[in-house]
């Protein structure tokens, strides 16, 4: 009986942790932007300078279900579109992200624009701007672990306009990017006696390159660093292989918090589908069955005289 009671206490504590993550006090901060394991194929969600980087019209959808089996766990759905404009100096894109964690949810829609300049025969540096709005809702009073007046914890339909910037340099085999997708630190909600919550500015640094191991196998190491004031640095390290320009497979390590693997299949020049599985190495890992992330992407090439090469990133 005591072990059951202890399990319930741990469960309640974890749910309270979700509540705190959903409505963060202004005096503290933590990672708020959605995590992506397949970040190297979903770059536009956090870096507007990525728009049009493959010189095709790209449509990508991704669904991430974190901590499966844990009630109220985060889940994220993302839809991304982007393409270069005629002349290929300018590119436009857009993204819609629906993010749910515990009793809080936010749906955001952003437009992206990138200006691209050549830095070599096959390399470009892009400067990007992102602008849009998020709709935030939360009902922390629905959690039995929070014993306060419900009126203090309800946020219904809070609009959060924001904008961001990004830099992205790439060649056929290398890339590096820096971005801050939301520069405004919007106040989400406040109550003099309970909580004052806000958004926090996040910075993303990414990089990677591709090495030919032999004629059938390529190796691509990559990384992502996420930084926000007052929170531990989040670092993803990835090692992926591409077999015969068809199948991606590899592993991921998230510094001090998780590990996993991913795979992707290239059906043809246009269609790709990918899957990633993460395991949490922190204490909350004992209460969930891992994280699943599924991605599908389709490229349209309006330049019929050009063949689409394999997408490395």
Region roles according to the model:
Residues 1-15:
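Bacterial N-terminal signal peptides that target proteins for export
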Residues 14-17, 171-173:
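Short hydrophobic "helix-edge" motifs at membrane interfaces and signal-peptide entry regions
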Residues 31-313:
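Subset of outer-membrane beta-barrel
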């Amino acid at each position: 009986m005591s072990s059951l009671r202890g399990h319930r206490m741990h469960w309640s504590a974890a749910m309270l942790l979700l509540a705190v993550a959903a409505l963060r006090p202004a005096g503290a901060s933590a990672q708020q932007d959605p995590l992506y394991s397949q970040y190297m194929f979903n770059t536009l969600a956090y870096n507007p300078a990525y728009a049009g980087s493959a010189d095709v019209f790209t449509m990508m959808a991704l669904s991430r279900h974190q901590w499966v089996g844990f009630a109220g766990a985060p889940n994220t759905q993302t839809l991304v579109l982007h393409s270069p404009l005629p002349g290929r100096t300018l590119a436009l894109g857009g993204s819609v992200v629906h993010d749910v964690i515990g009793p809080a949810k936010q749906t955001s829609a952003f437009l992206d624009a990138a200006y691209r300049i050549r830095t070599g025969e096959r390399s470009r540096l892009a400067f990007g701007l992102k602008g849009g709005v998020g709709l935030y809702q939360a009902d922390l009073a629905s959690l039995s672990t929070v014993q306060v007046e419900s009126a203090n914890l309800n946020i219904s339909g809070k609009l959060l306009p924001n904008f961001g910037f990004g830099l992205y340099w790439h060649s056929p085999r290398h890339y590096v990017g820096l971005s801050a997708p939301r520069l405004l630190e919007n106040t989400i909600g406040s109550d003099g006696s309970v909580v004052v919550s806000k958004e926090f500015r996040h910075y993303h640094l990414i990089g990677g390159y591709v090495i030919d191991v032999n004629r059938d196998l390529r190796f691509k190491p990559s990384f992502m660093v996420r930084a926000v004031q007052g929170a531990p640095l989040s670092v993803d390290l990835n090692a992926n292989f591409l077999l015969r320009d068809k199948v991606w497979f590899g592993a991921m390590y998230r510094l001090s918090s998780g590990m996993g693997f991913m795979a992707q299949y290239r059906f043809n020049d246009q269609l790709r589908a990918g899957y990633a599985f993460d395991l949490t190495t922190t204490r909350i890992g004992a209460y969930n069955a891992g994280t699943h992330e599924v991605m599908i992407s389709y490229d349209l090439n309006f330049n019929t005289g050009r063949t689409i090469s394999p997408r490395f990133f």
